[in-house]
């Protein structure tokens, strides 16, 4: 399995591995987690660790939104490449948004809702809808600090967010399709990076590169933080801008 940097990154730690999206690093994580005390590797052992933490962070469950949602699938084959999102991993964009929220909140996994409130014909509130915490991932804060810093570094390497006006943390992830179709573009992230208020996931089917997903995410953050006139964002036509990114 190749990394985008064919020369390799040398000896790096987790924060830089996230920043550089180093396939070698995370493949090695998957390999080592599949070893026993004698160093013998087991595909099933590696997958069981992946599935355990995927379950804790909610990736094996629907999100609770009030529309039809496909069931997620945590990879059950090809253990080592599964640690970089390959294998048989399959998730909806809403499930990845919940995943981003769990990271932003240092482990709080929510059941989501698309509804704010239910009112009567006079506007009186009959019921309010709030997301419910269904699990809290029990790992030490220094682990979350490493992840948060790594994701913050990712965004510093992507010029799509230059001059945004709010600090963002996130991760790109171009998904290969086949030789006949363009790749899917993906970005998950949250802002402000130091005190998150919003978490998002952007998927562009056959979007060629995650750089294009970053352009969309930049517009979304501009809109929700009211950083620019919405008419300059909601133009009613597709943007002609395209963007590439290397460290996916």
Segment roles from a protein language model:
Residues 1-204, 247-248:
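Beta-lactam-recognizing serine transpeptidase/beta-lactamase-like catalytic domain environment
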Residues 206-209:
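Short strand->helix junction
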Residues 92-98, 212-219:
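Short amphipathic alpha-helical face segments that pack within enzyme cores
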Residues 124-132, 218-248:
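Short, gly/Ser/Thr-rich active-site loops of penicillin-recognizing serine hydrolases
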